[in-house]
């Protein structure tokens, strides 16, 4: 499976359930292009902050099914290995990723990235130019990937593809 993230030089990825840096229009455009038509895996806190993502299916990882069950429509809910209306496990996600690896993308937050890091074969990281104050950080992961390649550059920021 793949993952996509934006990260400041000091590894900050969030602040108060949002992005700590000013809006980067080109990065939002890149995110939309990269995720369009795909199945996204997202943690509940991150899911709560996202706008409606048209033409994308979401698998929401949470321990609090009742907190979001009421307003999920046309989305699947993964609740500690149980999907609403259907059982699903982390093994199911791993199996699903083997068959649909080009269609399954982890989009955050930090706990979700860490939990699914063993399954991620390609990690697309927008390296945001600068250091920012934040309360959510991405731990080091680069050592898990053998290759890295700059795939996009805009406004002083670089998108690097890390692959195994």
Describe the role of every protein-language-model region:
Residues 1-164:
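Enzymes that bind and transform nitrogen-containing heteroaromatic metabolites
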């Amino acid at each position: 499976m793949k993952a996509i993230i934006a990260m400041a030089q000091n590894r900050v990825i969030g602040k108060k359930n949002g992005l700590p840096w000013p809006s980067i229009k080109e990065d939002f455009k890149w995110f939309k292009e990269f995720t369009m038509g795909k199945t996204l895996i997202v943690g509940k806190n991150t899911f709560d902050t996202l706008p409606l993502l048209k033409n994308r299916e979401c698998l929401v990882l949470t321990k609090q099914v009742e907190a979001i069950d009421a307003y999920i429509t046309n989305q699947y809910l993964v609740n500690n290995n149980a999907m609403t209306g259907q059982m699903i496990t982390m093994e199911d996600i791993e199996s699903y990723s083997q068959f649909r690896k080009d269609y399954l993308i982890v989009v955050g937050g930090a706990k979700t990235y860490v939990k699914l890091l063993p399954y991620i074969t390609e990690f697309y990281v927008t390296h945001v130019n600068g250091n920012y104050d934040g309360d959510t950080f991405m731990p080091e992961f680069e050592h898990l990937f053998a290759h890295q390649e700059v795939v996009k550059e805009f406004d002083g920021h670089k998108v690097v593809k890390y692959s195994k």
